[in-house]
């Protein structure tokens, strides 16, 4: 893999924040409330998988993964109804 620039790493971290927000909002009922359960579940599952992949990257330095790890835990425990 090509080494990432600091800007690319920052963009990846920002994208992780977007996934965290979406997972939390779907679970709280603040996003996708009008979508069916299967679509909400798929959204949470995809974003949780994205976070799991990104947290495992070896290029992070002092970025906090607390919110990402919490969203992963919440996403893995989520069952849409």
Where are these regions (language model features)?
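Beta-rich interaction/scaffold domains
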Residues: 1-81
């Amino acid at each position: 893999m090509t080494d990432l620039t600091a800007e690319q790493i920052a963009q990846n971290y920002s994208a992780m924040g977007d996934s965290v927000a979406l997972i939390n909002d779907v679970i709280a009922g603040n996003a996708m409330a009008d979508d069916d359960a299967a679509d909400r579940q798929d959204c949470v599952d995809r974003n949780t998988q994205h976070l799991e992949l990104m947290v495992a990257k070896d290029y992070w330095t002092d970025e906090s993964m607390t919110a990402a790890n919490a969203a992963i835990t919440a996403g893995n425990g989520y069952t849409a109804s």
